[in-house]
Every structure is written in structure tokens, then in C-alpha cells.
Amino acid sequence: MQELQPIIEEAFERRADITPRNATPQVKDAVMAVIDLLDMGQLRVAERTDGQNWTTNQWVKKAVLLSFRLEDNAFIKGGYTNYYDKVPSKFADFNSKDFREGGFRVVPPAAARKGSYIGKNVVLMPSYVNIGAYVDEGTMVDTWATVGSCAQIGKNVHLSGGVGIGGVLEPVQANPTIIGDNCFIGARSEVVEGVIVEDNCVISMGVYIGQSTKIYDRETGEIHYGRVPAGSVVVSGNLPSKDGSYSLYCAVIVKKVDAKTLSKVGINELLRGI
């Protein structure tokens, strides 16, 4: 794996000149090796180092970007329809044995691109998982939810209907959006721009969080940016301006719960009485 990084780094510096016809076999093989490792979950765009801290493997993201320079659009059969794209489906060559061994469910017309990883006991309702994404075991990706490029989704997460988890291939220095273990993301919520939602959080319906979103803790008065602390229950809200003439959207941490409480208490109960 270490021998792949310098090949990717060097090729990325001249990516504007690379085409499917002039790319060297060495570059093609290195990029496809990275995509295959991502697809199997043996390599990740971001990795947890300790606690709630994550490290981004920027060179892996560069390999994903390079993959778009190496492929022409191609005809992709879809059974009841057809597609035309540079990246094949993760399941293009799957048979029933492959699905059984994968240990996950895929409900039509869910789509996952080659280079995404789907863990054991994951359920993909009609949803979309982009290249470089990692969906860990026991997670539900509900109807019309989107897992963006290189996003990292933890264990036993529920992404409710219409949820959007942002992708961050461009700009390449940006970190991926990360959802920690045992989180619940409510319907039609959006978490984007490399925001980290730490473990055991509950995000209510219709909450939008980007890097510039104020995340206000009503118990302490503290304002966070880009990170939702572990165990937070979050709803949408507003904060007034200093002169009181207007208010702007924010996300509000209304309470904190531990993993034990989260496992015993229903989501609706946590969101009642806030």
C-alpha cells in the first residue's frame, strides 16, 4: 500500500494533462488498486485515530479524483434501464453468492459506486452511496438518503429519509464529512463540508450543518463550529443578532445523552420535552 502513495501523488500534480489514452499503466494500476482497496474496506479516506479524532488520507482522495481522469464514459446496463458514466456500479458483477457473502441488503433502485464500502448488516433502501464512502456495519441508509464521496458513516447509524451527507473531493484539502457510531440523523437533514458528528448523537428532522453553522449549546452557552460533540441531541433554531434586529439560523444542542440512555430510550422520547 505504501508503494502506491508516491505514484498517486506524482500523477496528481500533472492531473490536468492525464487522459484515458495517455495515462501510463503504472498510474492506471495504482489508481485501480486504491479503488479496489476502498471497495473492500481495506483502505479508507479517513481513519479514527483515538477517541473522537480522525485523520484524513489526502492521497487516497487524490486517487479517487484521478480515477475520473482515467476512464471514459461507458454504457452501463441496469436491468430496467441503462446508464452512461465513468464509474461502474459497485454491484455490476455481483451474483447472489456475492451479496450473501457481503451480508448487506440492497433495495431497488439503490445505487453504490465502485470504490465505496458497504459493511455487514447494512441496509440500503433506494438511496445513493458515492465513490470513496465507507458505510460501517449495522447502518440503515433510508429512502432517498445520499452518502457523498468519501463520507465516513459509523456503526449502527440511521440515516433517515432524504438525508444528505456531503462529499468533499473538491477542494482536495477539505476533510470528509464524518458521522460517528450509533448516531441518528433525522429526515431531510444535511451534514456537509467536512463536519464531524461524534458518537451517539441524535440530529432532529430538518437540521442543516455546515462549517459555518453555529452549533449552540443551550446549557453552557458555548458555540461550536464544524463538530457536534458526542451524545448531543440537536434541533434547528435561531440566534438573535447583538442588536436584536434579526436572527440567523443555527443548530441547537438541547441536551446530552450517554450511549446507555440512547440505547434504551426511543428517538421520539429524546426529542420530546426539549
Curated annotation (Swiss-Prot):
Where it sits in the cell: the answer is: Cytoplasm
Q: Which GO terms describe its biological process?
A: diaminopimelate biosynthetic process; lysine biosynthetic process via diaminopimelate
Its UniProt pathway annotation is: Amino-acid biosynthesis; L-lysine biosynthesis via DAP pathway; LL-2,6-diaminopimelate from (S)-tetrahydrodipicolinate (succinylase route): step 1/3
Keyword Membrane in record: no
The record's EC number reads 2.3.1.117
Alphabetized GO MF terms: 2,3,4,5-tetrahydropyridine-2,6-dicarboxylate N-succinyltransferase activity; nucleotidyltransferase activity
Q: Which reaction does it catalyse?
A: (S)-2,3,4,5-tetrahydrodipicolinate + succinyl-CoA + H2O = (S)-2-succinylamino-6-oxoheptanedioate + CoA
* Residues the record lists as binding substrate: R105, D142
* Keywords, ordered alphabetically: Acyltransferase, Amino-acid biosynthesis, Cytoplasm, Diaminopimelate biosynthesis, Lysine biosynthesis, Repeat, Transferase
Q: Which GO terms describe its cellular component?
A: cytoplasm
Family statement = Belongs to the transferase hexapeptide repeat family.
Q: Which HAMAP family match?
A: DapD
What does the record note on quaternary structure? Homotrimer.
What is the designated name of this protein? 2,3,4,5-tetrahydropyridine-2,6-dicarboxylate N-succinyltransferase
Biological classification of the source: Bacteria, Pseudomonadati, Pseudomonadota, Betaproteobacteria, Nitrosomonadales
Q: Give the gene that encodes this protein.
A: dapD
